[in-house]
Every structure is written in C-alpha cells, then in structure tokens.
Amino acid sequence: MAELRARLERARVDEEAISRALEIVAEQGYLDDVRYARLLAADRRAIDGWGAERIRERLQHAGVERDVIDATLEAFDHSSERDAALELLRRRWPRPPESDPERQRAFGLLVRQGFESEVAYDAIREHERVVS
C-alpha cells in the first residue's frame, strides 16, 4: 500500500482521493501487504535463490510494514535457509569450490543473495562434504 500511496503522491493526487482509493482497493482485496510479502518471498526464493536478508530489504523498499516482514520471514529457519543456499550453490558450482579464491567467490555470491555468513559457510561446507 505504501508503494501505491507514494506513486499517487508523486502524481500530485490530493490526499483525500488517495485515502479513498487506498480504502477501496483494500476493501476489494486488490492490495494485501501480507499476501504480497508471502508471494514475493516464495517467488524470489524459488526463482532467484534469494536469502531472507535480501527479501527483507526488498520488502522494506516496497514499504511493507516491519511486523508483516518479520512474520513472513519466520518461515525461513536456519535449516531452510541453508537448503536454499545449498541449492543456489549447486546451480552455480555443480562441483564444490576447490580453492580458497573459489570458496570466497561462492561465499560472496551467497552473501550478496541475502544469506547470513553462517548460512553461507554451512552451505559451502555441506556442498564439499556431500560431493567428497
């Protein structure tokens, strides 16, 4: 909703019209931040391999409230985060990184995708363990 409000304000729509428009679209179920957050999180995780932190940043940028973001990301426990990081790692590196520079590149990729350092390290170690 915050994103729509910002767009209408930039278009210089008066405040009363903005409030009424937001009320109507909310009543009709066209805008639902909870649903939006869940769908974005699921899509970005499945399609792009994003971690929880990158999803959090995107939702904050879209103006989703903190409590909605927190509730959405509660589903991402350490185990599911590690599994998602491992899946991304396997797509990019079918064979585990063999040298320290390769491990650093893999680590950098995972962190840029929004995975915490601990999750990235765990995924790299697991990738090396499973293939070895």
Where are the predicted features?
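An alpha-helical, amphipathic repeat domain used for nucleic-acid recognition
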Residues: 1-132
